[in-house]
Each structure stands twice: as structure tokens, then as C-alpha cells.
Amino acid sequence: MAPGGGLPRPVSSSHRHAGRYVPAMALVRILVDGYSLLHSWPELASSRPRHSAGARDELIRRLTLYQDAYGTPISVVFDGAGAPSGTPAAASTHAMEVLYSRRGKTADQLIERAVHRFSSFGEVLVVTDDHAERDTVISLGGTVWSCWNFIQDVENALAEQAENISHRNRQEKHRFQRRK
């Protein structure tokens, strides 16, 4: 933990490397408690229920952009009896995995199992506001961020990424105009 009890934030201590934003800590995977994050991020579902398919889709879209910026694989895990009907078969990739717990299992159980398996390969970050889950993840060797910290990091990373893309586009536009 950083001074003051907060966790270190990758954006504030990150640097650019080959077009990616590299966090100070090397992460093997980021595991997200999907409904915990949706509950803490009301802007994702301003006109629809927080646990709706539209809110989940927006969360997945933003996490995919965040994964594109950092390059660290992300698994977002939702409670439920499998994927909801109408969920596209290709919703997951290796870099952005979308998981739904099976009947009789919880997202927490899937996250704990993943932390146990991935921690032998390096640092695993879990995003949740569930205090019991946080304690379990820490006991398994994982690192935990609150949803609020993660939301701030995602928003900062996406703003920085958009600014860098805009800057790069302006540079290319000027370079192209000089050739004429």
C-alpha cells in the first residue's frame, strides 16, 4: 500500500513504451467484479438499470479501451447462471475476457480461483468493493483496488489516450498539409 493507505495508481507512475501505458507494477491480469464495478459507476447506465445488458456492454467497451491502452489482460466476471440470452458468442478474447458464473457458483469464487492460478505467474489485481472478497484475495497473494480507484484510473487513462491520439492526428495532418 502507498502512504496514506491508498493503493499505487498506474497512471500517476506510468510511462509510455511503444505506444502503451506501462504501469509501475507488472500485472499478469486484472480481474474485475463486474456488478461491483457497475454499482460504483452510475455514469455507465445513466438512462438504464445498472445491471442491464446495456450497462454491461458499456462497461465492457470501456474496459476494452483501457486494456488497449495498458496491454494488461482483463477478465470481468459477472454473477449469474451463465451468460444472459442474447450475449454474443465472441464477447471474449484473450485480452478482454467476459465471464459469467455458472449456476451454484459466484463471481467471487471464480475470481478467487483465478487469483490462486495466476499469482504464480506474477501480480494479479482484483477490482471490487466487497470487503470479504478483498480480504480473501489479499490472503491468496493478490492486490486489490477499490472500484472508485479503478474508475479514476480508467477515466484518466482514457482521457490521456484520447489526448495522445488527438495530438498524433494533428501532427499527421500538419505533416500531410506540408507535402502539398
What are these regions (language model features)?
Residues 1-24:
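N-terminal amphipathic/basic-hydrophobic helices that include classical n-h-c signal peptides
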Residues 27-32, 36-180:
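Nuclease catalytic cores that cleave nucleic-acid phosphodiester bonds
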